[in-house]
Swiss-Prot record:
<dbReference type="InterPro" id="IPR000456">
    <property type="entry name" value="Ribosomal_bL17"/>
</dbReference>
<dbReference type="Pfam" id="PF01196">
    <property type="entry name" value="Ribosomal_L17"/>
</dbReference>
<dbReference type="GO" id="GO:0006412">
    <property type="term" value="P:translation"/>
</dbReference>
<dbReference type="InterPro" id="IPR036373">
    <property type="entry name" value="Ribosomal_bL17_sf"/>
</dbReference>
<protein>
    <recommendedName>
        <fullName>Large ribosomal subunit protein bL17</fullName>
    </recommendedName>
</protein>
<keyword id="KW-0689">Ribosomal protein</keyword>
<keyword id="KW-0687">Ribonucleoprotein</keyword>
<comment type="subunit">
    <text>Part of the 50S ribosomal subunit. Contacts protein L32.</text>
</comment>
<dbReference type="GO" id="GO:0022625">
    <property type="term" value="C:cytosolic large ribosomal subunit"/>
</dbReference>
<dbReference type="GO" id="GO:0003735">
    <property type="term" value="F:structural constituent of ribosome"/>
</dbReference>
<comment type="similarity">
    <text>Belongs to the bacterial ribosomal protein bL17 family.</text>
</comment>
Amino acid sequence: MKTKVGFNRLNRKSSHRKALLKNMVISLFKHEKITSTKAKLSEVKRFAEKLITRAKIDSVHNRREVSKFIHDKFILNKLFTKISPIFKERKGGYVRVIKLGRRYGDAAEMAILELVDKTLEEK
């Protein structure tokens, strides 16, 4: 009997899926906005929310836990010093998915994933 899985497999092997999600989360924190298919972005949103919640308390333990997922030291430092202080008072909902419509080639649902507070615009 088939049972429901708690996440979307995205038609990939587990190692490919993990690498895809890690790279997309790093791109989100680097550029503060990414565009992709809605299915991928809804999975990336889950991981990004967990990482931002973990980064709100800056401790050695939390840095090590987040660094298991984010291997880029520059992005890790940006998450803990610039992104997470913006969301100190917010309990959740740090990231939003905005639907764009369908892609021309294969009619896949496209969307934008962005951080909610846009105070990081000064680069």
